[in-house]
From Swiss-Prot:
Pfam family, one: Peripla_BP_1
Disruption phenotype: Decreases expression of genes encoding virulence proteins. Decreases virulence in mouse.
Known DNA-binding region: 3-22
BP GO terms, sorted: regulation of DNA-templated transcription; response to fructose
Function: Global transcriptional regulator, which plays an important role in the regulation of carbon metabolism.
Entry superkingdom: Bacteria
Protein name: Catabolite repressor/activator
Origin species: Salmonella typhimurium (strain LT2 / SGSC1412 / ATCC 700720)
Disulfide bond entries: none
Domain HTH lacI-type: from-to ranges: 1-58
Gene, per the UniProt record: cra
Keyword field: Activator, DNA-binding, Repressor, Transcription, Transcription regulation
């Protein structure tokens, strides 16, 4: 049923019916009797106004796009969960897309969200810093906010973890273990987040004489880490200390080790980005740093909504949020 039909059945003009349905009856001095006539028809025919159409007329769809690289990454899904809940409470719908850490996929996701006329976009980019894709919005008021992986700080605002500081803290803790063989397992070294985590690790390890083997997977996916680690084990012994730059990479290592040996060595010291309570069941020492997911989501949404309320482009810059350190495995029981 359309608004014209509601007006006809209530015996009022289309404009008056619109005022009543959109809660503007008092503002335009529509009588209580007329309001009741219109609302009686609305209730009888279970009429619901088209929110999308109303938003488009106002230049808004009350929708926000979110592009993340991996839906299996629990850190991203937790942040997405908080974002969706908080956006919904504020009357916005969150449209989620996954780039699978592929630049071409990410660019298509962005284009599709723009075709849906979202009011803003939140993105955890898989594009290298020098890529020109986002520069078209460098001087555009359309709000694009970077999550977890920073965009050009001169033109965009980013909310990220303190990757370098967190990696340095984590590596300092790992250094306390008497391991002789050390493996650093990262991925996609061309990404700023990967570079910063490696820099933090190297800073912590610079005065340590123990040699570190550096491995880089071609994606942050569990399967990519498993394939790389399995091949590496063909020519190397199991390391005594392991540093992984994401939880999915650690899962790949665990998959290979469990298939091969049936368990993780009890003397393997693990340090990882990402956390899960199930790590407490391991018999080896585990150090994990985890994002403060709620804090990250609240800060990102605060920036987005402020830019929509003004409206104005978010102020360029970088907000770093430190991660929490957790002691898991046998460390949780000591």
């Amino acid at each position: 049923m359309k608004l014209d039909e509601i007006a006809r059945l209530a015996g009022v003009s289309r404009t008056t019916a619109s005022y009543v349905i959109n809660g503007k009856a008092k503002q335009y001095r529509v009588s209580d009797k007329t309001v009741e006539k219109v609302m009686a028809v609305v209730r009888e025919h279970n009429y619901h106004p088209n929110a999308v159409a109303a938003g488009l007329r106002a230049g808004r769809t009350r929708s926000i796009g979110l592009v993340i690289p991996d839906l299996e990454n629990t850190s991203y899904t937790r942040i997405a969960n908080y974002l969706e809940r908080q956006a919904r409470q504020r009357g916005y719908q969150l449209l989620i897309a996954c780039s699978e850490d592929q630049p071409d996929n990410e660019m298509r996701c962005i284009e599709h969200l723009l075709q849906r006329q979202v009011d803003a976009i939140i993105v955890s980019t898989s594009l290298p810093p020098e890529h020109p894709f986002y520069q078209r919005w460098a001087n555009d008021p359309f709000p694009i906010v970077a999550l977890d992986r920073a965009l050009d700080r001169e033109h965009f605002t980013s909310v990220v973890g303190a990757d370098q500081d967190d990696a340095e803290m984590l590596a300092e803790e790992l250094r306390k273990f008497p391991a002789e063989t050390v493996l650093y397992l990262g991925a996609l070294p061309e990404l700023s987040v990967s570079f910063l985590r490696e820099q933090g690790f190297r800073t912590a390890w610079k005065d340590d004489p123990r040699e570190v083997n550096f491995l880089y997977a071609n994606s942050y996916e569990r399967e990519a880490a498993a394939q790389l680690f399995e091949k590496w084990l063909e020519t190397h012994p199991m390391p005594q200390a392991l540093f992984t730059t994401s939880f999915a990479l650690l899962q790949g290592v665990m998959d290979v080790t469990l298939r091969r040996d049936g368990k993780l060595p009890s003397d393997l010291a693990i340090a990882t980005f990402g956390d899960h309570e199930l790590l407490d069941f391991l018999q080896c020492p585990v150090l994990a740093v985890a994002q403060r997911h709620r804090d990250v989501a609240e800060r990102v949404l605060e920036i987005v909504l402020a830019s929509l309320d003004e409206p104005r482009k978010p102020k360029p810059g970088l907000t770093r949020i430190r991660r929490n350190l957790y002691r898991r495995g046998i460390l949780s029981r000591s």
